[in-house]
Amino acid sequence: MTNTQQPTLPRPRTPGPEMAALDRFYTNVTWTGTIEPNGMGPGSPAMTAHGQGVHSRLHDGLWIVGDYRQDQFLTDGTFVLTWRLHWVTGWDTDAEQYSATLNDNYGHADVMRGRIDGDRLIYETPDERPVRLRLTWDLTDPHTPVWTNEVCLRGDTWQLVESYRMRPAAADAVTGG
């Protein structure tokens, strides 16, 4: 019998404490809020919106998947549009940071980097871009979590695009699409 060493084969990773820390930011939710004037581009009006998000876990908990739908209205109640987003996030062990990918029904696709700062989860697009986004989940008040979207143009100051108050929703009360 020959004593030969077998090659070590890579094994799938398992979720660590970083995913446990991330998990509390991704419950199924509904929300209402506002979109700032110029938030959807120069000259766009102020709007209101309501939406919903449902989350699941992928690859034995290594990734969190979010599917979101939001209806937007002019301040007089006139329907403007329905926006949908598919989001996948988790701990990137190699980069030692949270990473997320997003795709929406308007043809946008992006990659974001994230971090947890106390009760806030913050994702940003990379620094080198002329238009940067920052998404923040703020659980400082656990009874009234807030989600915000901000934009930074060519290194200028961050400007609020939209802000929403979230409420927990049962998994079967939220539908994707």
What are these regions (language model features)?
Residues 1-177:
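Hydrophobic small-molecule pocket/channel-lining residues, especially in calycin-type beta-barrels
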